[in-house]
């Protein structure tokens, strides 16, 4: 499988590749996905959080932040797998030009900082910034923004404040990994929601919101423009670990097709873009695929001597 993708990249000139990643790239880091066998969308009680609901009343915000308080520790501190590390090596080698991701876990940034996760406040920058061509379409769960003054702050700092304000709740309840969502959300009982104490922006007292694109929100226009520019100038577009079900990602595949940019899809099962690609690799492990691609194109094993 890696052989076919490596040949595809060589045929496209070994440069200016644009990558589009989804939740399937992070499952091997312990972050649950949406549409896999145990994915979020297969759970009967799943109801997406929309911006409208989030703003409609304090009870909805209490429910979100209660879930997030218990679920965040699962996605915080996650380490990169060989998908993230392989893509970073391809970027360093000049093969990959831009990396567009639907993921909010910050692991593509972390790859540029060695790939080892940490739950410390100091690790914030490693999950939220890098010079590795990453463009986060849906935001970053490790950041929180104030809806009044616009201040962006570390989610880990908010976790400390939430746990201090809800000390007894934190002692009484522990998140189970099987219930945690890809964005660090966690299903909690109503009694927890009722007891939840919210905290406000430390600068202006405004409402805090996760710095991610909620269901029904639009990807920021500048981000969309940047992504379109990268895709239209690419030698190829490689979609990794994504079923491309949401239009915010699918539109870039359509743009590549319109521009005559060759498309490869590397993921498990069917996608919404099937039939538009030049190459389809069906795999349950994007990490294994990337290990093979790096070995063939760059001549070394991930984690070994370069």
UniProtKB/Swiss-Prot annotation:
Enzyme active site: 138 (proton acceptor)
Note accompanying the cofactor annotation: Binds 1 zinc ion per subunit.
Subcellular location as annotated: Mitochondrion matrix
Residues annotated as domain Deacetylase sirtuin-type: 1-301
InterPro entries documented for this protein: DHS-like_NAD/FAD-binding_dom, NAD-dep_sirtuin_deacylases, Sirtuin, Sirtuin_cat_small_dom_sf, Sirtuin_class_II, Ssirtuin_cat_dom
One of the Pfam families matching this protein, by short name: SIR2
Binding site for NAD(+): 22-42, 102-105, 241-243, 287
Enzyme class label: transferase
GO cellular component: chromatin silencing complex; cytoplasm; mitochondrial matrix; mitochondrion
Entry's Gene Ontology BP terms: regulation of DNA-templated transcription
EC number(s) reported in the record: 2.3.1.286
Top-level taxon of origin: Eukaryota
Co-factor requirement: Zn(2+)
Residue pairs linked by disulfide bridges in the UniProt entry: none
Entry keyword set: Metal-binding, Mitochondrion, NAD, Transferase, Zinc
Keyword Transcription regulation: no
Binding site for Zn(2+): 146, 149, 201, 204
Gene3D superfamilies, sorted: SIR2/SIRT2 'Small Domain, TPP-binding domain
GO molecular function, one term: zinc ion binding
Recorded catalytic activity of this chain's protein: N(6)-acetyl-L-lysyl-[protein] + NAD(+) + H2O = 2''-O-acetyl-ADP-D-ribose + nicotinamide + L-lysyl-[protein]
Chain's role: NAD-dependent protein deacylase. Catalyzes the NAD-dependent hydrolysis of acyl groups from lysine residues.
Other known facts: This protein may be expected to contain an N-terminal transit peptide but none has been predicted.
Family, as annotated: Belongs to the sirtuin family. Class II subfamily.
Stated name of the protein: NAD-dependent protein deacylase SIR2rp2
Species name: Trypanosoma brucei brucei (strain 927/4 GUTat10.1)
